[in-house]
């Protein structure tokens, strides 16, 4: 298998020039949440693991989602530090957590630096496990810094048989699977029941879906919602994934960037929604976007995949956050006022994969973590029952889909049934290593167009400038005719 070179590995992160790549990397950031400040110290591909298991398991991620899954569901956990910086396993192994936020490529930048320095680091300072997202998965799995989950770590086809195929395909190169995940991330449209009743006369998911089953109908509902004083969407980015996940080809072929026609449909729709007041001009993750999901919000709905329901939307719906003593129950904010339907197009959003780092001296522990947290049917089912996350086991999800399971947050709806149907429609064939950077640059470039600060041609030019600065190896940009 042809791996990404060290130079191009750095370039794919979008933050270094050729000169910087050749100079490698400097020190780490003091903002890192890490129990150990020592950084690995030289470039490396795979190194032979030590015969004996290490006493420290270093795990890198960008938020506390996997940390919570690990601490709550990995059977070998014995003790968790009060500040959660470390977890102690029953065999005495210390798990050290390094958490660097995702914004502006921060997580990837620091991870890349550490991986390039992996080979000469002390054993207890080497990265053992790191997490990756769908938008940049290929950058890592098509490199020498990641272990094959079967050949190197020891998982079998039988172990992985219950998982959704797309979750294996996206982290596979030339037949080598180089990551595994506990979750599948099909997307749905989450809407406010109370607003749907006022605008459409019903809050029933099946009936609401008939009004939202294609983009023309969706736009009609946006007009009806506006007439009632509501926004259809919160901001510029909300519908983006439904368009970007349905493109006809990857972003990049060779060194040429091709802007898919479907992305320009998103531009046209978002410009129309902004001009007509169908959105609140928010951006993904900003305070307005979060507020629009809460008790004072007047937004019809949000495009969310599986993790978004339980990890983001639920929290934003509460008047009193759980951190302030609030409970996840009807009566706290608008808990119970959301429901979900398929929406106008199938899509996915995100997903987190566990990778074993080349050079780790904890292969048996990595194997056990992967087995328990991504392959164990009972654990997968329990995670879903407890958290409403959609886990990566087809049999377990089908059982819940066909059961009397109900989500109190979604007004008694069994949303797992809809996710189970949507999961089979996920197509990751056009995913590529530049996706995160190009998607972010595209969205950012057109915000000035949506708000009327620049014309469309200027937004296109700004996109081209941004990506050539971020990825100097990309030479051309082709727009739809």
What are these regions (language model features)?
Residues 152-159, 168-239, 251-284, 358-364, ...:
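Helix-loop-helix "hinge/cap" segment bordering the ligand-binding cleft or interdomain interface
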Residues 69, 193, 370-400:
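Periplasmic-binding protein-like
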Residues 100-113, 213-217, 281-293:
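Short helix-initiation/N-cap motifs at beta->coil->alpha
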Residues 332-336, 384-444, 448, 476-481:
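Long, aromatic- and glycine/proline-rich binding clefts that accommodate carbohydrate-like moieties
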Residues 67, 71-76, 265-368:
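Extracytoplasmic/periplasmic substrate-binding proteins
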Residues 40-48, 119, 132-188, 325-340:
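Hinge/lid segment of periplasmic solute-binding proteins
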Residues 84-103, 122, 203-208, 271-285, ...:
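A local structural motif
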């Amino acid at each position: 298998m042809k791996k990404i070179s060290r130079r191009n590995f750095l370039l794919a992160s979008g933050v270094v020039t050729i000169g910087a790549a050749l100079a490698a990397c400097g020190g780490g950031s003091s903002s890192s949440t890490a129990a150990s400040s020592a950084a690995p110290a030289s470039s490396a591909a795979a190194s032979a693991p030590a015969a004996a298991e290490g006493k420290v398991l270093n795990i890198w991620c960008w938020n506390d989602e996997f940390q919570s899954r690990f601490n709550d569901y990995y059977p070998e956990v014995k003790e968790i530090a009060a500040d959660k910086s470390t977890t102690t396993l029953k065999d005495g192994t210390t798990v050290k957590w390094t958490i660097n936020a995702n914004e502006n490529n921060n997580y990837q930048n620091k991870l890349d630096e550490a991986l390039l320095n992996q080979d000469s680091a002390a054993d207890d300072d080497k990265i053992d496990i790191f997490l990756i997202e769908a938008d940049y998965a290929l950058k890592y799995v098509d490199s020498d810094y990641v272990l094959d989950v079967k050949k190197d770590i020891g998982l079998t086809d039988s172990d992985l048989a219950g998982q959704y195929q797309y979750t294996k395909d996206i982290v596979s190169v030339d037949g080598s699977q180089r990551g595994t995940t506990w979750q599948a991330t099909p997307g749905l449209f989450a809407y406010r029941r109370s607003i749907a009743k006022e605008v459409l006369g019903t809050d029933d998911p099946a009936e609401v879906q008939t009004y939202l089953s294609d983009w023309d109908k969706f736009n009609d509902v946006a007009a009806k919602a506006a007439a009632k004083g509501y926004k259809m969407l919160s901001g510029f980015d909300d519908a983006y994934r439904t368009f970007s996940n349905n493109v006809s080809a990857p972003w990049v072929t060779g060194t040429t960037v091709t802007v898919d026609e479907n992305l320009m449909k998103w531009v046209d729709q978002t410009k129309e929604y902004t001009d007509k007041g169908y959105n609140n001009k928010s951006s993904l993750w900003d305070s307005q976007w979060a507020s629009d999901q809460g008790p004072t919000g007047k937004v019809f709905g949000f495009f969310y995949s599986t993790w978004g329901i339980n990890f983001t939307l639920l929290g934003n719906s509460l008047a009193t956050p759980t951190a302030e003593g609030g409970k996840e129950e009807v009566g706290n904010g608008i808990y119970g006022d959301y429901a979900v339907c398929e929406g106008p197009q199938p899509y996915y959003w995100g997903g987190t994969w566990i990778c074993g780092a080349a050079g780790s001296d904890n292969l048996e522990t990595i194997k056990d973590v992967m087995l328990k947290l991504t392959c164990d049917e009972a654990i997968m089912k329990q995670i879903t029952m407890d958290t409403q996350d959609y886990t990566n086991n087809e049999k377990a999800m089908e059982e819940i889909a066909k059961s009397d399971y109900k989500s109190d947050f979604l007004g008694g709806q069994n949303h797992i049934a809809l996710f189970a149907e949507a999961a089979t429609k996920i197509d990751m064939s056009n995913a590529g290593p530049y996706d995160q950077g190009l998607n972010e640059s595209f969205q950012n470039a057109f915000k000035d167009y949506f708000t009327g600060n620049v014309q469309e041609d200027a937004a296109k030019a700004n996109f081209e400038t941004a990506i050539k600065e971020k990825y100097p190896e990309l030479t051309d940009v082709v727009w739809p005719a």
